[in-house]
């Protein structure tokens, strides 16, 4: 029972941190004092569940990684058409961001500017994994469909991920007014016409 209660408190702390990142407070540095107040516990109680604020952010990053990579793998299992796979992966990341504005501050790096360098490296690694996955999807087109692209796969993967990252940054910069999935079909039509 004690383990379950501790697990629930950890989740409560992470949810509170995500909510703070989504609020106006998320535009500035979040202190453990503010977070403790939001959760309704002392700072010491926070540290009973997490050894540092960096570990709290890592908990959110782990959630982001698990959510995105699990769903990307599901897309790859279910869909075989190269362009549809790319479209679905792009839409997945944008929709995840739209549903989780606080976590988008982490994905964009905004919430990590004054935090431990290790956290920024984790986000960079996540985007590297996604870009590698996109590159692999693009490379497999030749095997699956007997077609190649007019441009190298690494350049296309970087362009696709750059489009996604730009949408995430715009979402954060606008204080979550510009939804990442707004006009997605039009953006996709433009992008896919360039890479067919």
Swiss-Prot record:
Keywords: Cell cycle, Cell division, Coiled coil, Cytoplasm, DNA-binding. PROSITE patterns: HTH_TETR_2. One of its GO terms (molecular function) is DNA-binding transcription factor activity. It is found in: Cytoplasm, Nucleoid. Residues 31-50 bind DNA. Its main location: cytoplasm. NCBIfam families: PRK09480.1. Required for nucleoid occlusion (NO) phenomenon, which prevents Z-ring formation and cell division over the nucleoid. Acts as a DNA-associated cell division inhibitor that binds simultaneously chromosomal DNA and FtsZ, and disrupts the assembly of FtsZ polymers. SlmA-DNA-binding sequences (SBS) are dispersed on non-Ter regions of the chromosome, preventing FtsZ polymerization at these regions. Homodimer. Interacts with FtsZ. HAMAP family: NO_factor_SlmA. This is Nucleoid occlusion factor SlmA. The gene is slmA.
């Amino acid at each position: 029972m004690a383990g379950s209660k501790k697990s629930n408190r950890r989740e409560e702390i992470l949810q509170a941190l995500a909510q703070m990142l989504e609020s106006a407070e998320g535009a500035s540095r979040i202190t453990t004092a503010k977070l403790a107040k939001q959760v309704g516990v002392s700072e010491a109680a926070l540290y009973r569940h997490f050894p540092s604020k960096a570990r709290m952010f890592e908990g959110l990053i782990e959630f982001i990684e698990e959510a995105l990579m699990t769903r990307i793998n599901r897309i790859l299992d279910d869909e075989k058409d190269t362009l549809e796979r790319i479209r679905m992966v792009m839409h997945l990341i944008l929709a995840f961001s739209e549903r989780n504005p606080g976590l988008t501050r982490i994905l964009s790096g905004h919430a990590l500017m004054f935090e431990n360098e290790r956290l920024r490296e984790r986000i960079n690694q996540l985007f590297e994994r996604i870009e590698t996955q996109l590159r692999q999807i693009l490379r497999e087109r030749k095997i699956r469909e007997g077609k190649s692209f007019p441009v190298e796969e690494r350049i296309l993967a970087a362009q696709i991920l750059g489009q996604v990252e730009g949408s995430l940054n715009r979402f954060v910069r606008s204080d979550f007014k510009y939804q990442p999935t707004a006009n997605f079909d039009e953006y996709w039509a433009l992008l896919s016409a360039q890479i067919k």
